[in-house]
Structures are given as C-alpha cells and as structure tokens.
Design a protein with these regions (language model features):
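Receiver (REC) domain switch/output surface
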Residues: 119-132
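Alpha4 helix (beta4-alpha4-beta5 surface) of REC/receiver domains from two-component response regulators
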Residues: 68, 72, 79, 92-110
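Two-component/phosphorelay signaling modules centered on CheY-like receiver
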Residues: 16-38
Length: 145
C-alpha cells in the first residue's frame, strides 16, 4: 500500500513507557503510519504533517508542569483543523472528564487499561466507517437535488 493511502496516527502522551508500548502495538498490528509526541506543544508544531487521527492523553503534565494539558491541546488542534478526529486517552474513568472532552469536540474517550489498544483501534475504525457513510450520504443527497 502506498504511504498516501495509509492512515497517519499521532500518539501524544507524556508517559514514555505507555507511549512506546502503544506505538509498538500500532506498528505490529496495523498498517498505520505512527508518529509519537511527548507534549501537546510538539503535536501542535507538527500538525502540518496532516495526521488522519490523533490519540491524545488528557493529563500531559508528567514532563513539565507548565505544559499544555490535553484539553488545551485539543482546543488548539480543533482551531488548526476542526475535522481532525481526536481520541482522548486518560487513566481517569470519571464521567465528568469524558463529558468535558466531548464538549471540546473529541471524537471519543478511552480509559487507559490493558485493552486500550483494542478500544483505540475500534474507535479509529468507527470514525473512518462513519466518514465513509457520511460521504456516500452526501453524494446521494446531491443527486436528489
């Protein structure tokens, strides 16, 4: 498959061990192009590489307490391009945190666990299936006009 057709995923997490393990899972079990970033600032600086989806940690304060948190990073990503799907990832399983992420236009919210990779993979698949159906619907609607 050509690189042009491959899905490009940005992984953003300040937990180096978790980030590396997630990167390895994606490289071994998918055909995605994977880029990793330890801070929201680095992710924002690389948005010109046009990621297809971003997996973003909610906290992001493990390296630098003054660094942007996940919500601030999410807001800047959406300012750059509102169409980039962002899946929030967190060790917090509080419903308020998930709702807050969705209010900031996250596509999904996944709690960090031993099944995170599978949930993330399903969320990415769901997004691209939804996008395909939406394009088909728009095509049919344009034919009816």
């Amino acid at each position: 498959m050509e690189n042009e057709a491959k899905i490009k995923v940005f992984l953003v997490d300040d937990d180096a061990v978790f980030l590396k393990s997630l990167e390895i899972e994606f490289i071994h079990h998918t055909d995605y192009i994977v880029e990793t970033f330890a801070t929201g600032e680095l992710c924002i600086a690389n948005l010109d590489k046009k990621p297809d989806v971003i997996i973003l940690d909610y906290q992001l304060d493990g390296i630098d307490k003054n660094a942007m948190n996940g919500i601030q990073t999410l807001d800047q990503i959406k300012q750059f391009n509102a169409d980039i799907p962002v899946i929030m990832l967190s060790s917090q399983d509080k419903i308020e945190v998930a709702v807050s992420c969705m209010h900031h236009k996250a596509f999904d919210y996944v709690v960090k666990s031993e099944t995170s990779f599978l949930r993330l993979q399903k969320a990415i698949t769901a997004f691209f299936n939804f996008e395909k159906i939406e394009k088909e619907l728009n095509w049919y609607m344009s034919r009816m006009s």
